[in-house]
Structure formats: structure tokens, C-alpha cells
């Protein structure tokens, strides 16, 4: 990638595929950013560039690279292999990590809790923010993983018919609204909605508050 191409990416600012860090944050935060980009559609992580696109540079390539590799290999499951390059730009050195659009989603962050309990949480990008993926989004990513693909059997019952009628009238629905509409549990609602997304009948939309679903 040429210097002009890199400068163009930086000039366009943060997005669903680009994250800037003036310096590497603590490892858990770094893992969340990497998880979010890999679980969305891949992209770039720049160290030494601030949110306002100003290039500050880094003090130690080795230290910053080690932080990224540690976050990736010890705080993510499954782990990711990133391409990490030091780049001299405007007389300053920055680090660029290329994060793949992974096939093996969701990449979950391992979060240590008291009593030796480890939580696993997936993250996604919504605009320039990294947010925790909803359980239905994480479930959908799991089904799309080539290691977990199963034959899809769809049956349209009364609850799906009520869902379609609701969407034709109101255009969108959340899991909570679907539970209330059909008097089913959250788990059952998620399974039903994810199956319909996989079948291409409805689509999921990521929102910083709640994911919602619409007809295709």
C-alpha cells in the first residue's frame, strides 16, 4: 500500500473498518477493537494516529506490535493472525494492523471475572464505534462460521405469520417486541429470527441501542 493510499484512509477518518489510537490502550480494550473489526468486515487499526486524524507517531514499534499480538493471541477466541507494518509517514513512524474479514466469526473477547470465571463477548462495529454484539447477532455469526454450518430447515408457523404481518405494517421489530407479539421466550425468539435471516427472508440491522429486523 502506498503512502498516498494510507494518507487517504487516514483523511477519511474512523469508520466501521478503520480505528485510530494515539497509543495502544490496555489489552482488553485493544482486543475489543480488533474483535469488532474482524467480526464486521475487516479493516485497519492505526497506532500513532489520534481520533482527529492527526499523526503523532509511536515511541517503540516493538512495544506497540507486542501489545497488538498479545491482545490478539491471549484475549481473543478464536485467535487471529494480523498483518502488522511499521510505516514512516510525514517523518513519523506509525503502526498499521490489517485485520481480516474473518470466516471464523465470532471472535470473542475473554473477560476475566471474579471466582476464576471467564466471560466471552463478541463485538461489532457500528459506524466508528465498537459495541458488544447482541446475542442474536453472535448466534448468526456462529451459524455463518464454516465449522458450524448446518442444514437449514424452515417451517412457517403462526408466530412467523404474525411476524410478517407486523413487519408489513410497522416495517421493523426487535427481539423484545417479537417476544411480546407472540408470547414466546427470548431464546425462542432469537432462534426464530436468526433462522429467518439465514433463509434470506428478513435481515438484521445493527444499532447501538438494540438490533432490529426488517423484511428483505
Placement of each model-derived feature along the sequence:
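Conserved N-terminal catalytic/coupling substructures associated with nucleotide/phosphate chemistry
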Residues: 1-216
Amino acid at each position: 500500500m502506498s503512502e498516498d493510499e494510507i494518507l487517504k484512509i487516514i483523511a477519511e477518518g474512523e469508520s466501521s473498518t478503520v480505528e485510530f489510537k494515539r497509543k495502544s490502550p490496555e489489552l482488553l480494550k485493544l482486543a475489543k477493537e480488533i474483535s469488532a473489526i474482524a467480526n464486521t468486515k475487516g479493516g485497519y487499526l492505526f497506532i500513532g494516529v489520534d481520533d482527529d486524524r492527526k499523526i503523532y507517531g509511536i515511541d517503540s514499534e516493538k512495544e506497540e506490535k507486542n501489545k497488538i499480538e498479545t491482545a490478539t493471541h491471549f484475549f481473543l477466541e478464536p485467535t487471529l493472525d494480523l498483518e502488522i507494518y511499521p510505516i514512516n509517514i510525514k517523518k513519523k513512524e506509525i503502526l498499521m494492523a490489517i485485520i481480516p474479514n474473518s470466516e471464523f466469526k465470532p471472535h470473542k473477547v475473554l473477560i476475566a471475572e471474579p471466582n476464576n470465571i471467564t466471560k466471552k463477548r463478541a463485538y461489532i462495529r457500528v459506524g466508528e464505534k465498537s459495541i458488544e454484539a447482541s446475542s442474536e447477532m453472535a448466534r448468526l455469526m456462529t451459524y455463518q462460521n464454516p465449522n458450524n454450518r448446518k442444514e437449514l430447515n424452515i417451517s412457517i408457523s403462526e408466530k412467523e405469520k404474525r411476524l410478517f404481518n407486523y413487519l408489513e405494517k410497522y416495517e421493523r421489530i426487535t427481539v423484545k417486541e417479537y417476544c411480546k407479539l407472540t408470547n414466546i421466550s427470548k431464546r425462542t425468539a432469537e432462534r426464530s429470527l436468526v433462522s429467518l435471516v439465514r433463509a434470506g427472508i428478513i435481515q438484521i440491522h445493527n444499532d447501538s441501542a438494540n438490533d432490529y429486523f426488517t423484511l428483505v
